[in-house]
Amino acid sequence: MRKSASLLAAFCVALAVFGFAAPASADVPSLSITQVGYNAYGADTIFNRNQEFVDVKNVGDASVNVAGLVVADQWAKSHEGDNDRNCNTLKVTSLPGVVTGADSSVMLPAGHTVRVYSGRGVPAVSAGGSVHTLFMNSHCGYHGHIWGNGGDTAWITLGANAESFAYDFDNGYTVKP
């Protein structure tokens, strides 16, 4: 009994000294950031902002409802409460090639990818129907380029679940986790 009381006391002291932090969120189930195109070829202009993108892939074995999925950079993530213009974010409400359910569900099939470009364009399906492209049409950042060439963090959030991929400049144009 004395040993148990001593262990409990030691645990309480450690908890008070070092604190306890529960994770703020869990990874987004079955979804992963698989690539970030962060550095457009040449100088950043409004004409090449679609060379910047984020790929979010369903790595699970079943379809995932991605309605409400938010793709954002670190600046947008840190300004969630005061980002009235929704700079540097895209919220999925539909996908090209996917029928939106009566309950507003947007089911991304297993193995399929959502590619979110920073610029403007027409949503489409490519790569044999497995890549669904969306566009932020960002008017924020430098000429609509939102991904930091020197490093940034890509975030995906779905409900209470969030995950991120941080990168640094590596003399390239795209990075993968």
Cite the ranges covered by each PLM segment.
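Activation on beta-sandwich/Ig-like modules and their edge loops
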Residues: 19-151, 157-177
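Secretory targeting and sorting signals
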Residues: 1-26
